[in-house]
Regions:
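Ser/Thr/Pro-rich, low-complexity mucin-like regions
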Residues: 89-93, 97, 232-252
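Substrate-binding groove/exosite segments of carbohydrate-active enzymes
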Residues: 204-222, 228, 235, 239-240, ...
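Active-site neighborhood of glycoside hydrolase catalytic domains
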Residues: 497-503
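Short, hydrophobic/aromatic-enriched beta-strand segments in well-ordered soluble domains
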Residues: 53, 64-66, 101-105, 235-247
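Short, solvent-exposed loop/turn and secondary-structure capping segments
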Residues: 2-4, 14-15, 74-77, 99-102, ...
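Extended, loop-rich substrate-binding clefts of extracytoplasmic carbohydrate-active enzymes
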Residues: 18-82, 174-225
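Residue-level detector of short, conserved catalytic/binding motifs and their immediate flanks
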Residues: 49, 83-85, 99, 239, ...
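Polysaccharide-binding surfaces and accessory modules of carbohydrate-active proteins
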Residues: 64, 69-196, 225, 256-311
């Protein structure tokens, strides 16, 4: 019996306007080819998900726990580019069971993340997968040496399992090849020969061969790692998988606001990723994850336990845990310059807008949107202060105002003397928030030195607001007030006024 560790597809995966519910065709096709488990039950608190699989056709219960390391206050651990999976298999039958738990990963180096992957996909081709065993793990290292090192889509991925004797199909051509590999698994699989020949991917002699060399133009390889198991009745075993990645060359790939600058032509602007300065490649990420596995799991689950064991209701726990999800989604990133950057959100199949369906929406560090966000300051206050530094050092205009959008890279001219867009002039609620957030930064441990360095800029901003909207000093804001609604408010109103209320 060959089954995907996936619940049976539902008839109508409808989603709300804030969640993508589109299931890719390749996933439904694979589910039909491999079959799925009859039942799948989800539980968990972000960033930990637990799924229990069961099926009357299987004498096994399977429990999967998956997480990405996340520790409040520790930015580096919380931005390790990896996914960590633990599968616990338990024999629920009356007889011994043997099988293979396999994971597969597409070598996506060169893919733009947008073009549909088919028989011939531009960007793919020349992809290379390599086997690496050692330290109790079996790995497939994936990259594309045909790309220049500076290419936006150059990078590396690693799929690994914590069984050095796992059967590895490093270069799998597709779903049918994968199915043939899984169907060929035998109890007498020849693993003993790996002791003297560790470079063999699959030690089983009567099994499908893998591909060889770089992938053909427009094509790529899957990497497959299969861990064999034998379980007596009532016996269980836990198998760990990880997938790690490293794509250093983040570029500006969204349309920025403000006036057009045709003089920039077709220039591609580099932003990079901070994690790429800590790790030279994905194999280094994977080495770190393997070495620190127990620590990373313990520190991550300590956070979720803090929530779930509190006096909060389950609904409140879910609400609070969800707040950190967007900070660690593609909405946000830390560039190679060490600055924290955040879009207003992420685009997708159910969240499309004028700028399309891919990437981040409405760049960048929008003060009139991020002013209503609180998780960053509570969980990673250094990143919150990082945003203040950008607002004061880069975005602030000579007259003290702060445009509500950042243009990147930050060495480009900012929108201090041009129409910004959404709204056209600097958003007042965003500027008021910068002052209030500076107070919160102090309350969260920024220190007197930070305040002393920022005080002149805070005063300039305060005076700009007071002179333009509260010239009579009565503590009430007057006039046209650009806001987060991408429109201007007019006259006295509590929405904007309660952000002011000076002593």
């Amino acid at each position: 019996v060959i089954s995907m560790l996936q619940g049976a597809p539902v008839a109508d995966p409808a989603a709300s306007l804030t969640t993508d519910g589109v299931v890719p065709t390749w996933m439904t096709d694979a589910a039909e080819r491999f079959a799925t488990f009859e039942r799948a039950a989800y539980s968990g608190t972000y960033p930990v998900a637990e799924i229990a699989f069961s099926d009357d056709a299987h004498p096994l219960d399977v429990r999967m726990r998956v997480l990405n390391p996340m520790v409040p206050g520790d930015v580096e651990v919380s931005s390790i580019p990896t996914g960590m999976f633990e599968f616990t298999l338990r024999n629920t039958g009356d007889y011994a069971v043997h099988g293979t738990l396999a994971g597969s990963l597409l070598n996506a180096a060169g893919w733009d993340g947008i073009t549909p992957i088919g028989e011939h996909t531009p960007g793919l081709g020349g992809n290379v997968n390599r086997l690496r065993r050692g330290g109790g793990w079996a790995r497939v290292v994936m990259d594309n040496p045909s790309l220049d090192e500076s290419d936006q889509f150059a990078g590396q991925l690693v799929l690994a399992a914590d069984d050095e004797s796992a059967a590895v199909l490093a270069r799998c051509a597709g779903v049918e090849h994968l199915h043939a590999f899984l169907a060929s698994r035998a109890l007498n699989d020849g693993r003993s020969r790996l002791a003297t020949a560790p470079t063999i991917g699959d030690p089983q002699l009567n099994a499908p061969r893998g591909g060889s060399g770089p992938s053909a133009a427009g094509r790529t390889w899957l990497g497959v790692v299969g861990v064999p198991f034998w379980l007596e009745p009532g016996e269980s075993r836990t198998v760990r998988f990880a997938m790690s990645w490293h794509f250093a060359n983040r570029m500006v790939d969204v349309e920025q606001f403000g006036q057009p600058h045709p003089e920039w032509g077709a220039s591609r602007f580099y932003l990079g990723n901070a994690y790429a300065l800590r790790y030279p490649d994905a194999l280094a990420v994977q080495d770190d994850v393997e070495r620190r596995w127990n620590e990373l799991v313990a520190r991550t689950t300590a956070w979720t336990a803090t929530l779930t064991r509190s006096s909060l209701s389950p609904r409140e726990v879910d609400h609070l845990a969800a707040q950190e999800a967007y900070v660690r989604s593609p909405t946000c990133f830390v560039g190679a310059d060490g600055r924290f950057y955040g879009h207003e959100g992420s685009l997708g199949a159910s969240t499309w807008m004028w700028s399309g369906v891919f990437g981040g929406s409405c760049p960048l560090n929008c003060t009139h949107v991020w002013q209503y966000e609180a998780a960053l300051a509570g969980l990673w206050p250094t990143l919150e202060r990082n945003m203040r530094d950008t607002e004061f050092d880069i975005m602030q205009a000579p007259n003290g105002s702060i445009p509500h959008r950042l243009r990147v890279p930050v060495y480009l001219p900012q929108m201090t003397d041009e129409l910004i867009g959404g709204p056209e002039e600097p958003a007042l609620d965003g500027m008021l928030a910068t002052i209030l957030k500076s107070l919160r930064d102090m309350q969260r441990g920024a220190g007197r030195d930070w305040l002393a360095a920022r005080w002149p800029a805070i005063v300039r901003l305060y005076r700009h607001i007071a002179e333009k909207w509260d010239a009579d000093g009565d503590g009430v804001l007057h006039g046209i007030q650009p806001s987060t609604h991408d429109i201007d408010l007019a006259g006295v109103n509590p929405f904007m006024g309660t952000l002011w209320l000076p002593p």
